[in-house]
């Protein structure tokens, strides 16, 4: 039985990530099995026929939670009065395409979307950004939507967290459920910081199970950092199904939190407990509070290895920010 209904917008509605994500969303994986969904699916003009096909499949899925499905090429209609937006649509990264090549094109897209959110979305709407370069795109959208709460903008780092989680599980030969406190800091890029020093295996420090520090620093970390490029090289396209799953999990950690769960998210750095510059979107370890708000987990120690990686990632975010104009 539906106890409430949320209004949700998904951009890039005809793309690969959205195609996987929409069915997870409709099933209740994000907001729960008792929450109805008023769904608006947006894509750019010229995609109307493909959008209609997506709607047909959602109708054919007979999802009880879908109260309404609207497909549109109008950002105003998509964002009008929404409680949450999943900004998936962007120019994709292909083989040989670097992040800097995406900044200008996608910056314009997210500036436009931020302005539309500012005009039409609810002030407390939560905004989840997926399109790369995701930290900077999220920052652009946030700064073009000053009416909305800055703390409610999230850049997706959950895919990086999941990649690290899986690698640690395989190396330790334990179930995924035995690995906790998996943390990714900084930028969603090849300069992200997969912080194994915080991780626990069976509630014990990771070093008790994986004692090979060289493997952690020189195999695991660069493998997680470069996994997106490896997927593109192998299949000729960027991650889609795994990204959609990570997006659903990222939002579920906020809307349906597990007690004590840590999750990595790119959030506004204003007033952060680590003394990092303000007005950035930076990946932090977070957890939900009883108030329904998240907090950046404070007072986590950084050893020399992690501190050095943190500075590299911070420098990249600052460089990206400096390269775009609002």
From Swiss-Prot:
Nucleotidyltransferase as UniProt keyword: no
Keywords annotated in UniProt: NAD, Oxidoreductase, Tricarboxylic acid cycle
Enzyme class, UniProt record, top EC level: oxidoreductase
A GO BP entry: tricarboxylic acid cycle
Active-site residues, as the UniProt record annotates them: 188 (proton acceptor)
SUPFAM superfamilies for this protein: LDH C-terminal domain-like, NAD(P)-binding Rossmann-fold domains
InterPro entries: L-lactate/malate_DH (IPR001557), Lactate/malate_DH_C (IPR022383), Lactate/malate_DH_N (IPR001236), Lactate_DH/Glyco_Ohase_4_C (IPR015955), Malate_DH_type2 (IPR010945), NAD(P)-bd_dom_sf (IPR036291)
Binding site for substrate: 93, 99, 132, 163
E.C. numbers: 1.1.1.37
Entry keyword NAD: yes
GO molecular function: L-malate dehydrogenase (NAD+) activity
Residues reported to bind NAD(+): 12-18, 106, 113, 130-132
Protein's job: Catalyzes the reversible oxidation of malate to oxaloacetate.
NCBIfam families: MalateDH-SF1 (TIGR01759), PRK05442.1 (NF003916)
Similarity annotation: Belongs to the LDH/MDH superfamily. MDH type 2 family.
PANTHER family linked to this entry: MALATE DEHYDROGENASE
Protein name per the record: Malate dehydrogenase
Lineage of the organism: Bacteria, Pseudomonadati, Chlamydiota, Chlamydiia, Chlamydiales
Gene (UniProt): mdh
